[in-house]
């Protein structure tokens, strides 16, 4: 469960459940301190976000303890996923720049 308490983001969930009819499809939503929306990312979905404002504060509520070793990263600008992040010149982390494309992703779900 994610929520923005300051600023705003575009938040994205990608279905990575191999047997799902919506496998590879994504849903995006704007979360902001003004709209106070929360977004549930269920198991079997990849999660990403792009901050739309400086000094954005983003909170997470997790169902399990965070396990960095299990984290895998999809390429943020993957052509197959075709996600509109709503930003023209994003600042992208090295980890996200070196992620794998969806076509080569092997899902654990």
Enumerate the language-model features and the residues they cover:
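Active-site region of the double-stranded beta-helix
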Residues: 1-34, 52-109
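Conserved SET/PR-domain catalytic core that frames the SAM/AdoMet-binding pocket
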Residues: 32-49
């Amino acid at each position: 469960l994610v929520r923005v308490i300051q600023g705003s983001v575009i938040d994205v969930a990608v279905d990575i459940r191999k047997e799902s009819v919506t496998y590879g499809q994504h849903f995006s939503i704007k979360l902001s301190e003004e709209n106070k929306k929360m977004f549930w990312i269920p198991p079997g979905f990849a999660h990403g976000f792009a901050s739309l404002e400086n000094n954005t504060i983003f909170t997470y509520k997790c169902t399990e303890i965070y396990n960095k070793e299990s984290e895998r990263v999809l390429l943020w600008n993957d052509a197959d996923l075709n996600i509109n992040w709503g930003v023209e010149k994003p600042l992208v982390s090295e980890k996200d720049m070196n992620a794998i494309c969806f076509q080569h992703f092997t899902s654990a779900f």
